[in-house]
Amino acid sequence: MPRFSSLSRYLFITSLSCLLLACSSSPTYNPSVFPYEIDQARVDQDDIKTVVIAHVNLGVVSRNYLTKEAPRIDAQVSAYLKENGFKVLPQREFEQRWNTAVRSYGNPVDPSTGKINMKSFTQIMNTVRDEMRDTGVDAFIFTDLLELQSAFSGGLKHVARWDGVTRKPSMQGAGDGVSADFDWGMLLDVASLQVSIYDMELKRVFAGRGGLDATQAIDMRSSKGRYVRRREILENETHVREGIELAFYPFIDSENWPGKR
C-alpha cells in the first residue's frame, strides 16, 4: 500500500508539472489580433506548394522609411515559408514580368496619392499570371508594410498592443528618464505586416496581419515629452519573426498565436 501511494503521488506531481509547463509556454491571449480571412476549401483545392513574393504592395504604397526595409522583411518572409515546406521562386521572376506589363498598361500607382488604380493593377496581374504559368507557381503573396498608430497603456507597466503583439516603449537620445508628466495616451507610429495570398485564378485565398514594432521612440532630449522616428527601423529580428508568424496564421499554423483557435 505505501508503494502504491508513493507511485500515485509521483504520477500526480509529474502530471501537474507537465500541466504547469504547458500553461507557462502558451502565448498570453491578446485581444488585438487581426481578424484573418481564409478560404480553406480553396486553399485545400489549390494545394499551394510553390509561391512567389511580389515586390509591390496590394494596397496603398508603404511610407518611404518602411519601403527601405521591405527587401529585408521579404527575405525573412521567404525564409519562414521555406521552413514550412514551401518552394519560393526568386522575386525577380515576378518583378521582370511586372515591369514588362507596366510598360503596356502604365504604372498603377498614383505618385501624388500613393493609391493604386485597381483596374490597371488587375490588367497587369493577369498578364503576369499568364506569363508565370510555366514556372510552376501556385500562388502570389503580397507583403505590405503598413504604418498604423497605437498608444501605450497607463499604470505601472506601459505597453502598446496592436495586431496581436505587445511592445514596450523605447527611448532615444540622452536624458535623465521619462518625465512624470509624459502623456502615455499620445499616439505613436507602429508597423504591421499585411499578407494577402492569391491563387492562379487571382482569387484571394488568405488575408492576415501581424504587428512588427513601433517605429517611434520617446525623445529623451524633450522636456515636455514627444515621439521621434527611431534611428533603426524594424531591427529586432525576434519582433519581426513574431509579426510574420501572426500575419500568416492560420495559413501556416503557429504555436505562438495569441488569439482564440
List where the protein language model places each region.
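Bacterial N-terminal signal peptides that target proteins for export
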Residues: 2-12
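Bacterial N-terminal signal peptides
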Residues: 10-21
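Alpha-helix termination/capping residues and helix-transition junctions
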Residues: 17, 45, 134-137
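Acidic/histidine-rich, surface-exposed loop or edge segments in extracytoplasmic proteins
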Residues: 47-63, 106-107, 227-228
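Charge-rich, low-complexity terminal tails
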Residues: 56-60, 71, 253-261
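N-terminal segment of the mature soluble domain
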Residues: 60-150, 192, 198, 202-207
